[in-house]
Each structure stands twice: as structure tokens, then as C-alpha cells.
Amino acid sequence: MTNYREIAWQGLWKNNPGLVQLLGLCPLLAVTATLTNALGLGVATMLVLIGSNILVSLVRDYVPKEIRIPVFVMIIAALVTAVQLLINAYAYGLYLSLGIFLPLIVTNCIIIGRAEAFASRNNAFSAAFDGLMMGLGFTLVLAVLGATREILGQGTLFDGADQLLGPWAKALTIQVWQVDTPFLLAMLPPGAFIVMGLLIALKNVIDKKLKERQPEAAVQPSVTRARITKVS
């Protein structure tokens, strides 16, 4: 029986694709200059993850083992193309901001990794849930990284939200503080490396604290059985 709680725990925290597996670092570090871009890429990746996991799970019994990887890549490429066309049609500004990193979702190791490790071995519903949790975990890391860099770099939050949600979302932009000159280190990839390292360190500290709080298993004393033989 599938343990959905364990799948959620693995995707969101224990085996988070961004903080633990360190997959998808290229777009993660390059696109997360703002929260809007981070959410856009995260949602696109999550949609592809869910769709690819479902399709791989459905065709797993019909694809020969020898050619499964090329077939999985073709499925992922088709889904990425569909998502790319949707973003191009309904969020053109975001499409321009994400640039080459949108089609490069095809090569993201998170997606092919989950297709091979989980979707090809489980039913469609479990595979879809795994894709949702892994995608959500990746999106959360992108969002935290993007929000931190945007606040430090230009003193705003949700800048350009209208590119993702439409003209009404301009009201969501928050001016955290007034910045005369942007903090370039936070806006450029070196700053992303630093913030990402701090997030990984924070997760390791939290994991260590949680492990220390767990009660140690009581040591059961060994019992030696005495054999009694009847003496006549």
C-alpha cells in the first residue's frame, strides 16, 4: 500500500530535489532573481513533473526496458513544449523573462529521475502525487531563494507579478525598503550560490535539531534462558 504521507515528506523536506538532491541548479540559480520568475519556473516544472509521471506510469508496461529512457525524454519534451506554448500565449512577459531556461526543463534531472525511480514502478495516482510533492518542494525552494534575492537586491517583493497573474497583480508588489542602487551581488548568480548555501546549511541545522529531539530507543537487556533438565 502506498504511503502518501511518506511521499509528501520525501518531496517537501527529507529528499527535497533542490536542497538535498541538488538537482536543477542551473535554472534554480539563474532565474530566481525575483519571486515572480521563481514561481513561474516552479509551477512550469511542477506541471511537467505531474504530467510526465502520469504518462510514464501509464505506459511503463508497454515500453521495452532497453529504450525506456529515450521514450521518457520524448514524453517530457512533449509536455515541456505544451507548457511553453501555454506560457507564451497567456504570460508572454514571463515567457521572455524565463528565456532559454523554460525549454531546458526537458533536461532537468528531477523530472527524468522521478520518471525512472518512481513513476515507472508505481500506479498513475501515486506517480501523480509524487510529481506534485517533488514539484511543490522544488517550487518552495525557488520561491524562498527568489524572495530573498529580490528583497536584498532591489528591496521589493512580487515585482512583476502582473507577468504571471495579469494586470490586476500589479497591486501585489510590495516595497520592502527604498533602494537607490540595486545590490548586484544578490541579483547575480554568485549571490544565488551564497543564499542557496545558507538555505542548505539551515536545513541541515534543523535536521540535526530534530534528530537530537528524538528519544533514543530503549536498550533491552539481554536475557539468558536457563534450561532446566528433570533429574530422576
Curated annotation (Swiss-Prot):
The keyword Cell inner membrane applies. The keyword RNA-binding does not apply. The chain crosses the membrane at residues 18-38, 39-59, 69-89, 93-113, 127-147, 182-202. It is a multi-pass membrane protein. The complex is composed of six subunits: RnfA, RnfB, RnfC, RnfD, RnfE and RnfG. Part of a membrane-bound complex that couples electron transfer with translocation of ions across the membrane. One of its GO terms (biological process) is electron transport chain. InterPro entries: NqrDE/RnfAE, RnfE. It comes from Shewanella sp. (strain MR-4). This is Ion-translocating oxidoreductase complex subunit E. Its EC number is 7.-.-.-. It is found in: Cell inner membrane. Belongs to the NqrDE/RnfAE family. The gene is rnfE.
